[in-house]
Amino acid sequence: TGRYSIALAKEGFDVAAVELVESNLAILKENSRGFDSIRAYQGDATDLGQFADNSFDTTLVFGPMYHLFSPEEVNRAIDEAIRVTKPGGMLFFAFLSVYAIMYSNALYGSWTCYQKENFTKEYKVKHFQEQLFTGYDVCEFERLFDEKPVEHITTAAVDGPLEALEKRPDFSVSEKDFDSIVVWHLAFSEKRELLGGSNHLLYICRKMY
């Protein structure tokens, strides 16, 4: 709907924004009026055929990986993002932690149902079309890039445990404490043992060639 595109445009970047859903595209176009540096397209992350190879300095894949379930679709989305990025360019892939999904949703609903939906009896992570969102083990997501022409820079937590905590009726923080939490979170956002507790994560890499 333009949140990221407008923020980047305000920082002086030229932005090509791709939206799958027509109604969301209309909102994006409406919200980005007056920003000549934003070009909005309707498209699919698994087929960015409207863009030539090596078109962009940076590519953000924010959202599609939450809703792609088959290995074929997942790999197409990754390959397309890499294809349209210039050699040496940066790529940012947002994804969800399956464990944080359990903590932030299952504890407030039916743990048994969520567990059956997200894990096999052997506790392997499941991905299937009927899931509204699909989550990953961090190492599982990182392995998707093993054979890709990219250099892994880092994997970082975006929101930490806040999504789970904000649902508690007794949870509140002062503005001063929230500012302190942000600084603290940024200091530890790449710490491996904390990654799985964050709902949203970023896989950050550089295209090699």
Per-segment meaning from a language model:
Residues 46-59:
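A short acidic, Gly/Pro-enriched loop at the edge of an enzyme's catalytic core
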Residues 130-149, 153-155:
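Short alpha-helix
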Residues 154-209:
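A C-terminal cap/extension of S-adenosyl-L-methionine-dependent methyltransferases
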Residues 75-90:
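A short glycine-rich, Lys/Arg-flanked "PGG" loop and its adjoining helix->strand segment in the class I
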Residues 112-133:
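C-terminal alpha-helical "lid/dimerization" subdomain adjacent to the S-adenosyl-L-methionine
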Residues 90-119:
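Conserved class I S-adenosyl-L-methionine
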Residues 1-48:
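Class I SAM-dependent methyltransferase SAM/SAH-binding core
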Residues 57-72:
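A short SAM/SAH-binding and catalytic strip from SAM-dependent methyltransferases
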